[in-house]
A protein has these predicted regions:
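The alpha-helix within a helix-turn-helix
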Residues: 1-2
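Short hydrophobic/aromatic patch on the recognition helix
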Residues: 5-15
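Short amphipathic alpha-helical segment with a characteristic S/N-K-E followed by hydrophobic residues
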Residues: 17-22, 32
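Hydrophobic alpha-helical connector segments
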Residues: 24, 35-64, 117-120
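A short secondary-structure junction motif
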Residues: 32, 58-65, 97, 101, ...
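All-alpha amphipathic helical-bundle segments outside canonical DNA-binding/catalytic cores
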Residues: 49, 85-86, 103-119, 136-143
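Short secondary-structure transition hinges
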Residues: 60-107, 115
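C-terminal peripheral helix-coil segments that are non-catalytic and often amphipathic
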Residues: 96-100, 104, 136-173
């Protein structure tokens, strides 16, 4: 409230409690992400470009995020419920991009992407609540898991694109 020059009283006039405030923030963030991905997808030449754009955006967010914030979300069951429901919808949307990537010869055609999506979601949730975040930043964990995943699902053509993307990321550091 102080950083925004808003009194707590004003906040509680607009929101009945912290959970409602958090929920509204997550709803707004989700809407922004949907708009962003839609814009990227409409201009992308292939499915990997969409995934790379999502990766960059998520990495930027995680760089700024304190892992304790995610752990504190356990205190707000409605927020967690919303996040889990949105994750299911996001996974369904991701399946469209994976299928497009299969058709483009970028992703392997012998993978059940529904299982992979659910496994990745569970893996990230497990990391958030584990001690690994005490030793490594969320952004590094996200990056390592994402590219381990990408290497497992891409064809040789897709792998060349992944390697080129990773090289460009290293050069920018």
């Amino acid at each position: 409230a102080c950083a925004l020059s808003i009194s707590k009283r004003t906040l509680y006039e607009l929101f009945c409690d912290k959970e409602q405030l958090l929920l509204e923030v997550f709803v707004m963030h989700q809407q922004e992400m949907i708009t962003y991905i839609s814009e990227v997808a409409s201009k992308a030449q292939n499915a990997l470009e969409v995934i790379f754009a999502f990766y960059k955006r998520k990495l930027s967010e995680l760089t700024e995020l304190n892992p304790l914030f995610l752990r504190d979300l356990r205190k707000y069951p409605n927020v967690l419920s919303y996040i889990r429901e949105r994750q299911k919808q996001n996974d369904a949307a991701a399946l469209v991009h994976y299928q497009k990537g299969v058709e483009e010869g970028i992703f392997r055609d012998d993978i059940n992407f529904d299982i992979i999506n659910q496994a990745i979601s569970m893996q990230f949730e497990m990391f958030v609540y584990s001690d690994i975040t005490e030793n490594y930043p969320l952004s590094e964990i996200y990056s390592e898991v994402t590219f381990l995943h990408m290497r497992g699902i891409t064809t040789p053509k897709g792998m060349q694109m992944v390697d080129a993307f990773l090289q460009s990321v290293k050069e920018k550091r």
